[in-house]
């Protein structure tokens, strides 16, 4: 998916890191709306790392932490969409996420379908713990292909921090945008 202008919005990581939950995300979404930022184009609400349990479900799917997100991601997405905003989530192309939760490596199709079912509009896809025997280009292309076939338009944000000469290969992956530097 390609967009005409860069998406703008709010991401939970820099302010809250792993200290996130449904109430905080909804409070932040409402603040975008009530402050007028949404009217100025800031319409993405993105949950970063640490939203899942440390193990996948028996069906192989990612599972939201029920203590943090008791109603699940679909209900949260529906509420964010009702505010006229877009819902974003986080996953990782490496062996695990940066905070050591389950990643989407080799589970791209399952996770893309799950994200689509939950109503996700944006996926921040990180680069932590990348297997040494896999190329970044391959990892991002796999997720983009899975998202493109999920039945829902989901913008892929490749968060590779400019590692591995990202600028030389990222366009070929179909990613809608990419991060060019580290924190």
Where are these regions (language model features)?
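Extracellular/periplasmic catalytic domains that process cell-envelope and extracellular macromolecules
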Residues: 1-4, 37-40, 80-82, 116-117, ...
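N-terminal hydrophobic targeting/anchoring segments and the immediately downstream early-domain regions
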Residues: 1-13, 45
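Conserved structured core elements
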Residues: 4, 19-22, 26, 70, ...
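Second-shell loop/turn segments in exported
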Residues: 12-20, 64-66, 130
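Aromatic-lined carbohydrate-binding/catalytic grooves of carbohydrate-active enzymes
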Residues: 28-132
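Short low-complexity, flexible loop/linker segments enriched in glycine and/or proline
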Residues: 102-106, 138-141, 171-172
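Glycan-recognition surfaces
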Residues: 107-110, 152-183
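Active-site and adjacent substrate-binding regions of carbohydrate-active enzymes
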Residues: 113, 118, 130-145, 158
């Amino acid at each position: 998916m390609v967009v005409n202008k860069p998406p703008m919005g709010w991401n939970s990581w820099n302010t809250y890191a792993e200290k996130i939950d449904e109430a905080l995300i909804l409070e932040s979404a409402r603040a975008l709306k009530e402050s007028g930022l949404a009217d100025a184009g800031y319409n993405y609400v993105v949950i970063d790392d640490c939203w899942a349990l440390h193990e996948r479900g028996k069906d192989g799917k990612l599972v939201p932490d029920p203590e943090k997100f008791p109603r699940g991601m679909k209900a949260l997405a529906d509420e964010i969409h009702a505010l006229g905003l877009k819902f974003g989530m986080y996953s990782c192309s490496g062996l695990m996420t940066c905070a050591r939760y389950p990643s989407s490596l080799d589970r791209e199709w399952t996770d893309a379908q799950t994200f689509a079912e939950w109503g996700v509009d944006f996926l921040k896809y990180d680069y932590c713990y990348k297997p040494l025997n896999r190329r970044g280009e391959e990892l991002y292309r796999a997720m983009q292909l899975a998202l493109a076939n999920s039945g829902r338009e989901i913008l892929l944000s490749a968060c590779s921090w400019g590692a591995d000469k990202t600028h030389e290969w990222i366009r070929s992956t179909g990613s809608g945008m990419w991060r060019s530097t580290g924190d």
